UniProtKB/Swiss-Prot annotation:
It holds the Pfam family MFS_1. This is Sodium-dependent glucose transporter 1. One of its GO terms (biological process) is sodium ion transport. The chain crosses the membrane at residues 19-39, 53-73, 82-102, 107-127, 139-159, 221-241, 307-327, 347-367, 376-396, 400-420, 438-458, 466-486. Residues 436-448 have a biased composition (Acidic residues). Residues 414-426 have a biased composition (Basic and acidic residues). The gene is MFSD4B. Its main location: membrane. InterPro entries: MFS (IPR011701), MFS_trans_sf (IPR036259). It is found in: Apical cell membrane. It comes from Homo sapiens (Human). May function as a sodium-dependent glucose transporter. Potential channels for urea in the inner medulla of kidney. Residues 414-448 are annotated as: Disordered.
């Protein structure tokens, strides 16, 4: 279900690009005057990441994801009905909040369920997002069609922005769009998101107790000594990585046409091969993650991105090198983000606020770096600024990850030593417990033997007293025969084995009857 939700997330995010011209026509604006809707969505995404980071620690995961997807559904249904640019920007901001919560909550839920063993699931989650982003233009093409889109683009380009804005002010805030195909494109994705949200609500009603178990188990996880430093460095790591990824994907077309001298069809193919290898390697990473550690995958990704970006800079006008290096660069960038999230979970626990922190870093990189590169590219059109950015970001991530690894593993070695000490102490305690058990058994056996001895002594005392009473009664008889037999009985009594030394036997005094001679 998480993969299904991220498939819808990819569709929701990517559908805006192919339908941007039609949205501009719907609000009677041209493209240049409507580009700030992306800024509104990005700010909403940042706010949603922060809000989701707090809510995911106090709410049920399924409930939070269901609510965020329901809000996304409402936004998708209302966007085509917006008739003013301001209302469309506000709607995009709310839409960004919902997808920010969904993005943060989905990543945290993967970590909460599978922990540091969730690398394949994390790769599958982000592959679903890439698949949705790949399918969105196809869906827009099927819904809108090339003819309607072309007509809308031409119409929006020739109308002046001022006249369109005055026409927009006279219209209502909401209204049925003139192009029904635009409505269907967003309605299909919105319906899909609604169905997935219903399933999440059902999971919340059915398995609400599992949330507490997952949160209780997460609280017992480890916390690195340099937890805050790791999060800050990971913030920078994702800032450079996501910024370079979005920058190259956004500007490779213009770079290929203006700097490398490619035709538009070839430049479009170069752009497609970047995103195609990106999505394909995210799919293959699901299987690679079962046999490779996340840290290994990050190292391989850094090596691939550094090598390919270096070749891009050195051979920036060679078409063959551009094709090969671009495909390698797209493949190398595919697994870095999900591998980074899975890797950090191996060393320190990632809760909602922590996940929101490095997601914000990725979002800021997505906004800031492309904006700066756009300005620099305009000032220095003869320089391959996009390629320099890719190389610089690869160097930055290549330096940051060893530092991250050093900070993460040093406390872990100490922790392992402490764990070994605790295990030894447990072993000693268990062995001492065994000794105590043996001593208790010995004491019980000794008590049993003592009880048997006491029983024997009591038996001996009883028999001794009975013999004494018998002998006394026999001595009182005034017959010579009994007296003559008594010494032998006395001797038998004195040599009897029942005389155990613990009780002193007194010799009987000799009594003689009158008128008898010995």
């Amino acid at each position: 279900m998480l993969c299904a939700s991220f498939l819808g997330l990819g569709l929701s995010v990517a559908i805006v690009g192919p339908t941007f011209q039609d949205l501009a026509t719907n609000v009677n604006r041209n493209i240049s005057s409507l580009s700030f809707i992306f800024v509104g969505r990005a700010l909403g995404y940042l706010s949603g990441s922060v809000i989701g980071g707090f809510l995911v620690d106090v709410m049920n995961y399924f409930l939070l994801l269901g609510i965020s997807m329901s809000a996304t559904t409402v936004g998708l249904y209302l966007v085509p009905f917006c008739k003013t640019a301001i209302l469309l920007t506000v709607m995009m901001s709310i839409f960004g909040v919902s997808i920010g919560i969904l993005d943060t909550g989905g990543n945290v839920l993967i970590l909460a369920i599978w922990g540091d063993k969730g690398a394949p699931h994390m790769q599958a989650l982000h592959f679903s997002f890439a698949l949705g982003a790949f399918l969105a233009p196809l869906l827009a093409k099927l819904a809108l069609g090339p003819t309607a889109s072309a007509e809308n683009h031409t119409e929006s380009d020739f109308h002046p922005a001022l006249n369109q804005s005055s026409d927009a002010d006279s219209e209502a805030l909401f209204g049925v769009p003139n192009d029904k195909n635009l409505l269907w494109a967003y309605a299909v994705i919105g319906t899909y998101m609604f169905l997935v949200s219903v399933i999440f609500f059902c999971l919340f009603l059915k398995n609400s107790s599992k949330q507490e178990k997952a949160r209780a188990s997460a609280e017992t996880f480890r916390r690195a000594k340099y937890h805050n430093a790791l999060l800050c460095l990971l913030f920078l790591f994702f800032f450079f990585y996501v910024g370079a990824e979005v920058t190259y994907g956004s500007y490779v077309f213009s770079f290929a046409t203006t700097h490398a001298g490619m035709k538009e069809s070839e430049a479009a193919g170069l752009n497609s091969i970047f995103w195609g290898t990106f999505a394909a390697c995210r799919g293959l990473a699901i299987f690679f993650a079962t046999c490779l550690q996340p840290g290994t995958m990050i190292v391989l990704s850094n090596i691939g991105s550094l090598t390919s970006s270096l070749f891009l800079v050195l051979f920036d006008k060679n078409p063959i090198c551009l094709w090969i290096a671009t495909s390698v660069y797209g493949a190398s960038m595919a697994t870095t983000f999900p591998s980074g999230v899975s890797w950090i979970e191996q060393y320190t626990t990632i809760h909602g606020k922590s996940a929101a922190f490095f997601v914000i870093g990725a979002s800021l990189g997505e906004m800031a770096i492309p904006a700066v590169i756009g300005i620099l590219q305009g000032k220095y059109p003869d320089l391959p600024v996009v390629l320099y950015t890719s190389l610089g970001a690869s160097i930055a991530t290549g330096i940051l990850f060893p530092v991250l690894y050093k900070l993460a593993t040093s406390p872990l070695d100490r922790q392992r030593k402490e764990d070994r000490k605790s295990e030894d102490q447990k072993a000693l305690l268990s062995s001492s417990g065994l000794n105590e058990y043996e001593e208790e058994n010995e004491e019980e056996d000794a008590e049993k033997w003592n009880e048997m001895d006491f029983e024997m002594i009591e038996t001996n005392d009883t028999m001794r007293h009975s013999i004494i009473e018998t002998s006394r009664s026999s001595l009182t008889e005034p017959t010579a025969e009994v007296y003559n037999q008594y010494p032998s009985n006395a001797l038998v009594f004195e040599s009897s084995p029942f005389n155990t030394g613990s009780a002193h036997v007194k010799h009987l005094p000799e009594t003689r009857t009158k008128g008898t001679n010995v």
